[in-house]
Amino acid sequence: MAFAPTGAPRHLTVFLDAGHGGPDPGAVGTTESGRTIYEADLTLRVELDTTAILRAAGFRVVVSRTRDTSVLRLGPGDLSGRVFTVQGSHHDVLARDVCANEAHANLLVGIYFDAGAPSYAGAVTGYDAVRPFARENLRFAKLLQTDVLAAMNALGWGIPSEGVQSDTGLGSALNSQALAYGHLVLLGPAYGDYVATPSRMPGALIEPLFITDPFEGSIAASRHGQEVIARAMAKAIDQYFAPGA
């Protein structure tokens, strides 16, 4: 879905992908109060907040979703009961690449949250280092990681940095094809029929918090935390497009 700028137009389009959704709730976390939280809900809220900020700054914004739904138009073999199969999960991410390309986006931003053991914490930003625009990927990833981490820690939250990393270390090996591919489908290159239509613009994917850490999960689930992340993401995007940057 596309949203026109509400501020003076800058004639730039940003594609925001709220990770997961619909049959795929993403990671399941918890807050300090014991409330169960779902990654797909949190990414959507951050996406929508970021959209409003960017539109006011003059950007045209295209988003992967505006509610709890898949991006993919579901087909045979995509669901098992009410959840995605491995095929469905893969097809859903491919659909996000298609959306970004059809939007003629100048920049792609993946919004996700991390998960792991309860002791795992910190922010990480991934980029793809083998695309023709790898230098721009890295430049934006550094801005995104720096600005989001600085905004959170300016409030005394003490979020560790997991740094800016190549997407070759961040993908999930859902099957042998995913393992052989070795990249995030949202950011990575073409790979036969597995990724026939990769994204065609620079981009990065951020996971600002571990929602399986109750402290970080509480931040991710709070409106204040979501707004802080959104403002910092919008700042990084604005810096990326700054003249002479």
Question: Predicted regions span which residues?
Answer:
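Short glycine-rich His-centered loop
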Residues: 11-36
